[in-house]
A protein has these predicted regions:
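N-terminal Rossmann-like dinucleotide-binding module
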Residues: 1-27, 51
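Core-facing hydrophobic residues within beta-strands of well-ordered domains
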Residues: 5-7, 70, 127, 163
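Short acidic-hydrophobic, aromatic-tinged amphipathic segments that line or gate anion-handling sites
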Residues: 31-35
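Beta-strand-loop-alpha-helix segment that lines the small-molecule cofactor/substrate pocket
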Residues: 42, 47, 59-108, 122
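Short glycine-/small-residue-rich Rossmann-like dinucleotide-binding loops
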Residues: 44, 52-54, 213
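NAD(P)-dependent dehydrogenases' Rossmann-like dinucleotide-binding region
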Residues: 103-109, 113-114, 118-140, 152, ...
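Contiguous beta-strand/loop segments that form the cofactor/metal-binding neighborhood of enzyme cores
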Residues: 150-252, 287-303, 318-320, 335-345
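C-terminal helical cap and adjacent loop that interface with cofactors, partners, or active-site loops
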Residues: 256-345
Length: 345
């Protein structure tokens, strides 16, 4: 459904025969495979979508796509499982002019840049702090930080500047994670441990960012999002919702006699109906991210959410692990270690 593109190949190594049949019907004229390397070699595509949610498969697929001359890659998130793989893909992109974009679709919502403009103009007052929480379901803790937290962390440099340092701790049932709590995590993400995480990031702007996730905290996904706490308002982001952003006006720490409600914030501003038609499809349907990737290829620029942004997000996550390994010590970014620090706990 993206203009200027045509699907030429589809591959799924775990596909059942009926899935292949369905793919043939969905993508008429495209070749369908159960081996992605064969698909790449036979179709030589310009753009490749790397779709597995299992992150340990991502790096090999990117390298295979680059080998056959792909010019752009649209990747499932999280990006990769450690900074070794992230560094390799960033270097590969620079060497070959390969544009890698990540499917953190909320970052592409046009209202995000409008919030940044309002912050810079002081229309919410002074930005004091930012707070993010994961879904805090059964995945609460480091898995939540990886899988859902990456959606949030990737957005924060837009408002706060790049991360420069981190302090963080992992807990298992209220006690700090030790070596015996560490094991291979789900979804090919590598080593992790614990069912709670509490982290504080120092950002380039001087405004702190907090991330917290506790397993089974309560109502499903009730806290999943980011809040920018300003002196005159709280700006709330709910991932994958529409409206995605709402504002509660007033001083955030002052008790009031009357309840204050939330005002939707769109690409038109506060209290303005979203001027873009079908905004849900454009964002949730990955239309805006795909169009940005096409423009990035044509203009020879970094995508809005590219490999560099992906690497920063991975580095933020692993900096929490590195701080925990050092008993909550402050660690600076970029990290010295490029592997998962929990392997050295």
């Amino acid at each position: 459904n993206i203009a200027r593109t045509e699907v030429v190949g589809w591959a799924d190594g775990g596909a059942k025969p009926e899935a292949v049949t369905a793919a043939v019907a969905k993508f008429p004229g495209a070749k369908c495979f159960t081996d992605y390397t064969r698909m790449l070699e036979e179709t030589r595509p310009d753009i490749v979508a790397v779709c597995p949610r299992h992150v340990d498969q991502h790096s090999a697929m990117v390298h295979a796509a680059a080998k056959v001359g792909a010019r752009g890659i649209y990747m499932e998130k999280p990006f990769v499982r450690d900074l070794v793989e992230a560094d390799e893909i960033v270097a590969l992109g620079r060497e070959r002019g390969l544009r890698v974009a990540l499917a953190h679709r909320n970052l592409y919502h046009p209202a995000v840049s409008v919030v940044r403009e309002w912050l810079q103009a002081g229309r919410f007052g002074r930005l004091l702090e930012a707070r993010a929480r994961g879904k805090e379901d059964r995945r609460g803790g480091p898995l939540d930080l990886w899988v859902l937290g990456s959606h949030l962390l990737v957005m924060t440099p837009v408002f706060l500047g790049r991360p420069v340092a981190c302090t963080g701790l992992l807990y298992q049932n209220g006690k700090p994670v030790v070596r015996g709590d560490v094991s291979e995590g789900d979804e090919g993400l590598g080593l992790m441990g614990g069912n709670a995480v509490h982290a504080r990031f120092e950002m380039e702007s001087g405004v702190p960012l907090y991330f917290d996730s506790v397993q089974g905290l309560g109502e499903k996904a009730s806290g999943f999002g980011i809040q920018l706490v300003c002196s005159e308002a709280v700006v709330d982001f709910r991932a994958d919702a529409e409206p995605m952003i709402q504002v509660r006006w007033g001083k955030p720490f002052r008790p009031v006699s009357e309840p204050s409600g939330w005002q939707p914030f769109t690409s038109g501003g506060a209290g303005v109906e979203e001027p873009l038609e079908d905004i849900r499809r454009l964002v949730a349907g990955h239309v805006l991210p795909a169009e940005d990737l096409l423009s990035a290829i044509e203009q020879q620029r970094e995508p809005l959410c590219g490999a560099e942004a992906g690497r920063t997000t991975v580095e933020m996550i692993l900096s929490v692990f590195e701080s925990h390994r050092r008993a909550g010590e402050r660690v600076t970014l970029p990290l010295q270690t490029r592997v998962n620090p929990l392997g050295q706990i």
